[in-house]
Amino acid sequence: MAQKHPSTSRSCASLRPNMESYILDELSARFGVGPSNGDPRSPHFSREGYLVASLFSKLPKSENTPEVRAQAALTKFLEADLRNARSNERLLFCEGYIHGKPISVILDRARSICASILGSGVDYRDVAMCGSFSGGASTSKKRGVSTAYFKFRELGDITERAMPYLERYVELTRYSELSDARGTLARVVPGNIFFTVPKNAETDRGACKEPDWNMFFQKGVGDYIRKRLKRVGCDLNDQTLNQRLARAGSIDGSLATIDLSAASDSNSISLIERIVPYELYAVLDDLRSPITRLPDGSDYTPNMFSSMGNGFTFELESLVFLSLTRAITSLFRVPGKVSVYGDDIIAPTDATPMLLDLLGYCGHRPNVDKSFTTGFFKESCGKHYFHGLDVTPVYVRRPLESRQNTFIQCRNRRGGAYTVKVPDRRRVIHLHNRLLHWGSLDGVVDPRLDGVIHELRSMIPEDFWGGRDVESIDAAVTPDLPRLRYHESFDRTDTSDEVVYLMCLNGSRTESTLVPKGAAFSEVATRRERKLCVSEITAGPGLLTSVTPRLQTRPNKTWLAKQ
């Protein structure tokens, strides 16, 4: 019988009582940084200080319960919509000036630019027919059963004004067969449903679950807008253009990076009507949700045109912001690059005073913490640069301890009992690997990270050492031998009608697999490979008669076959 391979890893890894405080204190001491070093606008800014200031900034605080964060997201959603109500009134008349230019003239130019991007002679009702279902949750289905299969197969939701689009879609496709069997096309609902997802330590992010068929047609229009934007150099499938421009702006200061606060919830109905050509606006207005159901069950009529969760919100806001930015640069004759990715805007530094005034008039507010119009620090699409150097920090977004077994009870040699926190292996591995990547810009790991790296590595069993991918959450990057994947192929060559049970002894655990006649069995071992020992391969009827290794490694497995 195979012997159990002794593990060299610690039997019980635990977290320090105040792991976050230890990491911050250790890094601050090793780097010699203080609070001022983490402020991008401070003359004492440094990459190391920025890491310390940002590392746990997105980790939810213990006193902020999920209910508190969800309520904060709802409050922010309603406050943004209150501003939309004022924007709707203001944009009806478009009175006032921005740096000597009438606002009405600027918005007319933006509308003209928007129309040129979209092209002419397009029937957007036909465009909506080219939609698709997403894998996200809807008003009728949870995320786990929200694939296209279930959304086509089961009865979906739709708003009343979007029903003509579904009727037309049924006429053009074979979906009519399924609808005839049901006797109805879809269930009519008033609108979408508000919900929240985790964002940072203070608040969640608000979004809305759209009716199934509304989302289907929304994505059709959104995909068309995305394709038209790509034709003019705004590729919403690629963030690297914004990132490259942000780096260029951090070198010479010629470009500004602007991030808008609650941008998806700040596109008022009047703004979209003022910027977007009527042919497209009419279709978008049919497909949007006119009513939002709040967590308390009440129905709310929003002043925003669409929210996050809508199938065309991202493309529509990109189109609007690109049109507004180009209107400013063309009317004020400011040269320079313009790029937009959602609410991340890159514009010439000289144009930012006028652009911010215009955005403010339209109901949008810049995120002060993430907008950099002066200086040499720039941030866009998740990348942060300072004088051309990548200073993007590492973020810990979830607690390092395991959620399933936060505490375990241990006993010391004297019989005393105590409890320790159990680390979440994947989160610890991810933090370990990301810190290694952050500290090795020149190919050599910063020795000042040694203390924290060794502390994190001590909480990772050695069976998960030897990784090579810094993005991995399953293997810690260490100098050890790589965690190779072992592949053995067992080919059955006899002609009997009997079946074969293949048993795998891995320590004290035994697994069995049924191998039918004429089939080949293969097993991939993902644990650290140790030793190859294939035993008791006995010839005879109904047995495996050949073993073909495909990769010569040292697996921590013992294989045997029996009748």
What are the functions of these language-model segments?
Residues 205-207, 217-218, 265-268, 388-389:
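Short helix/loop capping segments that flank catalytic or ligand/cofactor-binding pockets
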Residues 9, 177-180, 211, 215-218, ...:
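Nucleotide/phosphate-binding sheet-loop regions of phosphoryl- and nucleotidyl-transfer enzymes
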